[in-house]
């Protein structure tokens, strides 16, 4: 299998899996949503490189490598927050963004009902959260 096709397939599977978990009730935190962005970009870049392999693949390969390394770093940071190695952003613990007016306060109070803290994993398998698995998979894919 061509590397760009394999990268596309793995990336699509990762995104389908996390959306499925969200569909069945595992609510992601804000950092979890941000961890999806490199995968979305990798899907686009690898899909384009399937059709224009000879023209852009050498450049695309390096950009995809950087996205996987960045994804691994971000996922490692998030996993460290979940394991309480360090603190996350202030919005991870409180669920409130910068409040500038009474209307902002009311919106934040209403949004807290669906708030998921970043320091608590909503799903663990074999002791690792999805951030931990994202770290491992991004690291492996960056080596690939």
Residue locations for each model-derived region?
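Hydrophobic alpha-helical segments of small multi-pass membrane proteins
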Residues: 61-75, 93-101, 138
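Interfacial segments of alpha-helical transmembrane regions
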Residues: 1-9, 54-72, 143
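Helical transmembrane-bundle signal
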Residues: 8-18, 39-49, 68-78, 138-144
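Juxtamembrane "helix-exit" motif on the non-cytosolic side of transmembrane helices
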Residues: 18-27, 78-82
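Flexible coil/turn and secondary-structure edge motifs
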Residues: 49, 57-61, 80-86
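Extracytosolic (periplasmic/ER-lumenal) interhelical loops and adjacent juxtamembrane/interface segments
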Residues: 83-129
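Non-cytosolic membrane-interface motifs at loop->transmembrane helix junctions
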Residues: 26-37, 90-93
């Amino acid at each position: 299998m061509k590397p760009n096709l394999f990268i596309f397939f793995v990336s699509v599977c990762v995104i389908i899996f996390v959306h499925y978990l969200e569909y069945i009730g595992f609510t992601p935190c804000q950092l979890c949503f941000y961890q999806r962005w490199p995968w979305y970009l990798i899907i686009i870049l690898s899909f384009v490189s399937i059709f224009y392999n000879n023209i852009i693949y050498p450049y695309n390969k390096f950009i995809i490598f950087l996205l996987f390394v960045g994804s691994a770093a971000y996922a490692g940071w998030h996993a460290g927050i979940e394991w309480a190695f360090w603190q996350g952003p202030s919005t991870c613990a409180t669920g409130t963004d910068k409040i500038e007016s009474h209307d902002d306060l009311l919106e934040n109070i209403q949004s807290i009902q669906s708030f998921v803290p970043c320091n608590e994993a909503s799903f663990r398998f074999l002791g690792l959260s999805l951030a931990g698995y994202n770290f491992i998979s991004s690291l492996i894919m960056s080596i690939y």
